[in-house]
């Protein structure tokens, strides 16, 4: 049974601290009147708030006009500071001169705005109104500021806020006669005051007054609708939501909507505009089945009672689907009528996914940002179950396989870490946006499916049912879920062992990187087994993974590099059957050698000589002796084919090298879609394509029993195999297959369309596209391919077909854009363009479904113009496309026209001109969704520009214009647009397009300087500081972009016509990305923020802790020599990133070490916190040289084999190198010397040394420093320390014994050990020869520690040196041990 949960008033680890002084909203009522004629929204809200002792309640409000505030019916004092007012203020961007500096400025602005948005800006005085609010704020004591509402006695107040919405452009929108919300992050505050935090929830009562002929639909249960007494033309809709939710999930849509109740389940209601009603009725025929399936699978009713779905025009919504509590808003472009085929699958999956998010994401919520992945993964898992149930197991497995491939390609940076502080808590929710968010969602679902494989589907289902039933329990309702709780459920209900779960979650959830396996095999005929060699690698570098996990020592490094938990299964298909071999360990040695026994045996065959009386033509010769090479594998071994991880139990990239015939066997005989897809990919990747490959792909294409997506993959693989060397065999097979299905054999022309066979329709639809990508030796399309596509366009006939051919024609037109014309095929260009023009004119008169045909024509014209720029004028194409950008055209066509013009502008004039044109289009575009699409396309153009080797760069004027746009109010209204603009800056600077790795502290200081009109942060808990990301976590993001297509492609077409799951195409790295660029703070000339500014979070000085510890050190110097001055004088507040520190310990004898350890034990026993390895900020320049030591006295073997522990690290502000010389034996007595040199060069010393020296004060210690007391305590606690040291040694010995036992069974290790012993023996013999000619008595031992005082900085190097004496020949002393540790620390990282 899981442990009892902590009370909810305690802050969960990783959760953002609320900026409302502990105030908690228990219940909120919202009363709004919407005037459609004047376009005004006004009303009031009532909040039942548990007020803390401070007496101040902080709320979030933006774009609102606050008329009055009442507390328990009495007017009160309030202060309101809109954040967006200072978003228009000018910034000091004089230092912006290149993309790197512009990216720094954008990051500083973005992080600063996100931090400000987390701060409450509507402050309400809930105490007696006689006292002025500013006076009360000044009288708040330290204790009041840190006390939470859970600890204090509840003081519930009723706060009423009368307000109106000033700017209806963010959060809530007027579009024609429709009012709707967009549910963006941190935008609920833009239409009603609230605590706009996803982890702060309350129940709601909602009332909306609209014209009587309009419908207002919102979250919760509709209690009633009533006509207004004052105005009979108005009607009020009253909703109640008893389940506490975050304000973000409150949605509203009001307008002339048509209601379509579900015919099967009355709890489901569908709404849309009148002209979409027929499509809505056709689309929703299946939905009650998905609704019922989820309830049956989870053994619970829908938690919110009623479920509403509203479909609005695409230009009104920000994304294609938006979730609210019991209400989902979709774009109407996903609706389809009975004549459309291609949109069906995508629409059903999208609706099922939105319903799954109602269960996991809205109803069951994450406990902290680090748990977002879990709810996202559970919603994706539930959607996969729907796909498996209603679309088939093949569809579900194929989609999961493609998603896993995409995850493996992208999971190489810390941005893909599912649950860690750097990747979740500090990203302000941006980790769920864009392609990174998509990949994270796929990875979350895949990780949960791996767990389901381990525990079984029934056990996993019971866990989900337990989560839902626990939330529905009225006595102890717990509706939040954490990763820790899920692990407990997996242990108790799933029967998975705790050690396995700990390792599983640590490796797959708390870290990143996927295994890469390279497997080769060979059949041993004598032993009748398969000898397999496997090399395990990782998609992420080891040092980057260490930085995320936080490992520093060598032992931790070995644990992280140990691999992944579990054993991978190998499935061997033989002539007599199939067998599974779970023998490939995913941990341990990277190289694995396996032997898999075979159960089938081959009969011994001997070569038979031809008979003397045989026929002269040799008809009786042995046929097996001259078998073709392709059948050699089946003759010499009983293996048919081999599969690694057949059940997809790992998210792994597997490169299996097996003979060609085995791949062919797997493709033709294995019925699993994943195995077939892997075989096609492997055959396509071969450099030479034999007849057997082409023939196998052709057989799969023509076999109607094969899954249609596999047949499409085979068609594209055939196109890749077609070449002049093979006489265009692949192309001929594609054309022949198409003609056999669609052509009339008598006249040789296409037959009228007949799309009743859906799988056959999808396969034939992909054939023209596959033919268009066939290339010759010079990269040009063969004449036969161009002529065939022209023939299909010319003779397309859809008369008598009950289904629309709009997608069919769109693919044909897009195929024209994929062609590469040569001199021989240029004659077909004019007829093709003429056909495209006819289709454009026809679509203008009779618009196609969602303008698909016009979009395809625009895209093809732009592609053709870019490829034939010498023959086609760009000006002519631009004049042809420009009219499609008119505001009266539908959104999809308008955006496609803008994309095409941006592509042409980039190809003709460069990236700067394209960015200027993008900013012009962005201002002209009225819809939020259109702005996002334009920004995403421009981001792809920037990826292409950065990836090219050309000198095309962005000028300073364009960068400044982009920065002004980034800071404008237009961008504030659109959270997605703001994020993608930030990504553009990062891409132009050669950085990854993500907020991960961007410094959080330095940008905040610049923003604090600018924000001079914001209120004082009265909610800050004194003494607390914002958490800092670790240095390693900030620097492990790579320059890998996931949102773009490969470089060099001038136009990136969307896979919008075909319902095939697109294979994620990832670009090459944008540039040689220096990870320290994110870490190196720029704009050093910026002044430090004034801490007297009433807005800023006051950051306590970092000097206090280190200075206090230095006081202890000065009072108790560790060496016999008196300390002059501490190396650390001050710590600069401007550079708060963790810095590396060098610690050098010289231990000349065991007695000294024990005495020193006892002293430290005394300090700990007295409560004195003295960190002898404390970080001192930025390192100073210093060098320590330990020359070679030679002694004639014998040294014990244990000292000789002492392992030096060295951890190296590269810091941002300094360059450090550490080198240890090799051991040199000088005498027969195993005497050795070691060279050790360690240098540290300071990169950025502090510029305020004198001021820090003068102003620094040493605070008093906790206890008086009495040396006599120390001596008594030393004697008292000496034995205690000795006991702890003994236990540690015993643990270390046990660990070493286990390690030795494992190594004794490893043949590779034994061979290395033998060679190492042989090498040591030779070195000893050489040392004897050298010692005979050397006089060791003349040598001296020197141990020098030079401490060079530098300017105080953010890091310091502490060097502790014990005095050394010269040994004599009559006295033997043990050799001093040098121990170097490079660790990364930070001050006050709380």
Swiss-Prot record:
Keyword Transcription: yes
Chief location category: nucleus
Single biological process term from Gene Ontology: transcription by RNA polymerase II
Entry-linked InterPro entries: Aminopeptidase_N-like_N_sf, ARM-type_fold, Peptidase_M1_dom, Peptidase_M4/M1_CTD_sf, TAF2
Key words of the record: Activator, Coiled coil, Nucleus, Transcription, Transcription regulation
Bias (Basic and acidic residues) ranges: 1109-1127, 1286-1297, 1336-1347
Cellular component, GO annotation: plasmodesma; transcription factor TFIID complex
Coiled-coil intervals: 1286-1333
UniProt xrefs under Pfam families: Peptidase_M1, TAF2_3rd
Amino acid composition bias (Polar residues), ranges on this chain: 1244-1258, 1271-1284
Record region (Disordered): 1-20, 1104-1132, 1240-1377
UniProt note on tissues of expression: Expressed in roots, leaves and inflorescences.
Compositional bias (Basic residues): 1313-1322
Kinase among keywords: no
Superkingdom, taxonomy of origin: Eukaryota
Subcellular location: Nucleus
An annotated Gene Ontology molecular function: zinc ion binding
SUPFAM superfamilies for the chain: ARM repeat, Leukotriene A4 hydrolase N-terminal domain, Metalloproteases ('zincins'), catalytic domain
Known function: TAFs are components of the transcription factor IID (TFIID) complex that is essential for mediating regulation of RNA polymerase transcription.
Family: Belongs to the TAF2 family.
Subunit text: Component of the TFIID complex. TFIID is composed of TATA binding protein (TBP) and a number of TBP-associated factors (TAFs) whose MWs range from 14-217 kDa.
The protein's name in its UniProt record: Transcription initiation factor TFIID subunit 2
